[in-house]
Amino acid sequence: MRSDIVKKGIEKAPHRSLFKAMGYTDEELERPLIGVANSKSEIIPGHIHLDKLTEAVKAGIRMAGGTPIEFGAIGVCDGIAMGHTGMKYSLATRELIADSCEAMSKAHSFDGMVFIPNCDKIVPGMLMAAARINIPSIVISGGPMLSLNRDGKQLDLNSLFEAVGSYKAGTMTKEEVDDIEDHACPGCGSCSGMFTANSMNCLTEVLGMGLTGNGTIPAVYAERIRLAKYAGMKIMELVEKDIKPSDILTNEAFENALTVDMALGCSTNSVLHLPAIANELGIEINLDIINEISSRTPNLCKLAPAGKYHIQDLYSAGGVQAVMSELAKKDLLHLDLVTATGKTIRENIQNAKVKDYEIVKSIDTPYSATGGIAVLRGNIAPDGAVVKKSAVAEKMLIHTGPARVFDSEDEAITAIYSGQINKGDVVIIRYEGPKGGPGMREMLSPTSAIAGMGLDSDVALITDGRFSGASRGASIGHVSPEAMEGGPIALVQEGDIVDIDIPAGRINIQVTNEEMVKRKESWKAPKPKITTGYLGRYARLVTSASTGAVLK
């Protein structure tokens, strides 16, 4: 056993004494030691209940003959961090989570790992750690929050962000906003749409690192607790067979994840995180690969924010496996890959089927012939930008309008709420990239303000920052190179005419090459906003969004 290095032989008597100081018995130490990374906290609704799942996981480990050893992991609530300095830390914590889980596992020589995340950066951070550590591992997520029906409308957190915009526009009363506030988030779980957390939980299942149902079983269902027990039992099988993440997370597995990503219409953050996870294994996922997979993958789902359905509806319609079964009908997936279930994907989806074709479209009658995410390139974004095209109003798929330029999210929000943005405008928010932010903040507040004020079908937003999975409209992010590195987005001037053609994959400003060169010659990089502490270090080490914003 890997753990023998901390428990076997006379030389390890001091080590065993320390274990015994915590109550471990000789019998427990003779079994495989399984690290359990519990990210429970009292600041994230998606994590408030993870102590219950952790106990279920540990019960499963014990039932299968192992000894669970729990430790804590950090996590940021993106919703609470949204729209202020706190959001600068969100993406940066992905690396902290990966590093700290690596340190705990390596320092104590665990035989296997169970990772218990749920929300935005915790899921990819733990998957990065699993790939890096490369010992038998499994992920059991906390599950999605339920969406509550209120006055005939399904509510979610995004309903409230947009309600603030509606209130500012004078189309909603304070009492109406208060009512949504009290009911939009009815309990524990990751926010209920196909936002970033649920996107990554679903893709964890597709990658093969989670059990069937990991992405869609609601947080409050007893089935989620049973799944956690099975995950605890399953890790012992993976340890016995020495099935490691590198056996599961192959190039083909990432192609599957991107394919299902496009079919589900996942958050654009998924194409930031999947390359980062793959990078841990020496696998390259670039925007060209993403674009190629999107071009051949039909979009089968329009879940919130793209449509009215939520993750609980996807669960009722057959879950992720049902979507995979549809894709398999057109040979769009690699089916003979090993997964954490101990079975192949082909075996996992053998009995899966769509139970409601209103929620999951047939492969023969998709919402669109191409995927939910599109990659754009042009003289604003020569290295690429991404947009969740499944959440873009049809009239905005092709758009031309004047640039309204802001050098921070805060400036843009002030302008939007004060009525300075008009129909047809293209809002440019720059110096919010991985280095410039630093931390590549999510722009949910400005996109929700635009939507809440009734402008989401008339105004586009382009940024070198990112978007929440809850953002909708012509929200084009991850513009690379970013402004802080002298990317062309730094050269856009107020009033420049911007051409957006999402179907053609193009994004340009109507400015000559000669003028762009002239502007670049006079451009000077602004002073870094933060130079000390973790964010100062992060800004110096982080790479482009086009390669996953990993640290080098």
Curated annotation (Swiss-Prot):
The keyword Membrane does not apply. One of its GO terms (cellular component) is cytosol. Keywords: 2Fe-2S, Amino-acid biosynthesis, Branched-chain amino acid biosynthesis, Iron, Iron-sulfur, Lyase, Magnesium, Metal-binding. Binds 1 [2Fe-2S] cluster per subunit. This cluster acts as a Lewis acid cofactor. Pathway: Amino-acid biosynthesis; L-isoleucine biosynthesis; L-isoleucine from 2-oxobutanoate: step 3/4; Amino-acid biosynthesis; L-valine biosynthesis; L-valine from pyruvate: step 3/4. Functions in the biosynthesis of branched-chain amino acids. Catalyzes the dehydration of (2R,3R)-2,3-dihydroxy-3-methylpentanoate (2,3-dihydroxy-3-methylvalerate) into 2-oxo-3-methylpentanoate (2-oxo-3-methylvalerate) and of (2R)-2,3-dihydroxy-3-methylbutanoate (2,3-dihydroxyisovalerate) into 2-oxo-3-methylbutanoate (2-oxoisovalerate), the penultimate precursor to L-isoleucine and L-valine, respectively. The active site is at S468. InterPro entries: Dihydro-acid_dehy_C, DihydroxyA_deHydtase, DiOHA_6PGluconate_deHydtase_CS, ILV_EDD_C, ILV_EDD_N, IlvD/EDD_N. [2Fe-2S] cluster binds at C119, C191. The keyword Amino-acid biosynthesis applies. Mg(2+) binds at D78, D120, K121, E442. It comes from Ruminiclostridium cellulolyticum (strain ATCC 35319 / DSM 5812 / JCM 6584 / H10). One of its GO terms (biological process) is L-valine biosynthetic process. It catalyses: (2R)-2,3-dihydroxy-3-methylbutanoate = 3-methyl-2-oxobutanoate + H2O; (2R,3R)-2,3-dihydroxy-3-methylpentanoate = (S)-3-methyl-2-oxopentanoate + H2O. Its cofactor is [2Fe-2S] cluster; Mg(2+). Pfam families: ILV_EDD_C (PF24877), ILVD_EDD_N (PF00920). The modification N6-carboxylysine is found at K121. Its EC number is 4.2.1.9. Belongs to the IlvD/Edd family. GO terms for molecular function: 2 iron, 2 sulfur cluster binding; dihydroxy-acid dehydratase activity; magnesium ion binding. Homodimer. This is Dihydroxy-acid dehydratase.
